[in-house]
Amino acid sequence: MTGLINPSGFVLACPGSGKSFLVKREIADVFLRNANADILVIDPEREYWKLAEAFNGTVVKFSNGSKSYINPFDFDIALLDDEEVDVIADKCQLITSFISCMDSKHPLNAQEKSFVDRCVRKAYIRSGVLDTLDPADMPTLETFLDCMKKETENINKDMKDKLIVTIDMYVNGSAKYFNNRTNIDTDNRFISYDIRDLNGNLKTQSMLLILDYIWNRLSRNRDLGRATYIYFDEAHLLFADEYALDYLRMLWKRARKYGGVLTGITQNVEDLLKDDKSRSMLSNSEYLALLKQNPTDAAKLQDILHFTDSEIQYVNDTPPGHGILVLGGKDKIPFYDEFPRDTELYSKITTNFSETAKMLEAKAE
């Protein structure tokens, strides 16, 4: 993929078609071949921990009861000197997306977005971090909530009270997990962010915050001359929310300049295709790995990607591991991923339940 103008892309497949195996095989290949690359995985289903541990990576588990935290307001101080980035504006967009995910059925209107934007900016000013440049002075959701409560200029009281009630749950209520300072270790070159134990909107919000946190890693790695490979499984969770999708698109556009390669992985192709923004991300991706698709999705993909009838057959009713690569938007390469099963690496990347059970049984003997 190094020869592609923008190597970010997608892995799309039905359940049981070899999607996770293909991705983990690629991760292993990147890790072993490129010592100057970091690998970061957002793992909603706890599928990557064995591979991470095999390579002495770090698995960071997020849940309501865990002690691993990411502060939504955190950012790399060095970004303040980056002329290509308005880090505070980006944070305003992130927090707007974060709040939108709290109730995706009722997106923020223009007045609410303006209010949130104003309070985010005031939270950074009030915390003092823009003067001290000390990460310990970063604002938190509690700082943000306090700014909301004290804001009185040109405010609709009903709107303000509604947002305060919503945010209060994330500061003092059941979702206060997000009202903490970042404390995770990110020095390892292979990190898997495990969010399986988070449910519903909390999972989507965590994916959003982790992507933003990874953006900080991208910034540091660019200065170090290191590549950053980012894999986010269950990508359709981000497509369901307009603001989360907008934030993802922003990262997608910037990643290449920072040495980043983003790979979205999903079995819900329909969610990817139903929105013009995500369809645009798909059609403009220079790397696509397609395995078995259901007939409806295959027909839609054929239309968007201009497959011939013979080319689309490589994803119609095919065995696991069979598919087609689309590189540079035009080159289509059929593949069959046949991996030797009597190896230690295979045991770390297979997701076949019966095979895993047999391996555990043999190990016990």
Where are these predicted regions, by residue range?
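P-loop NTPase motor domains
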Residues: 2, 46-58, 64-66, 71-260, ...
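Charge-patterned, long linear interaction tracts outside catalytic cores
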Residues: 4-9, 13, 26, 116-149, ...
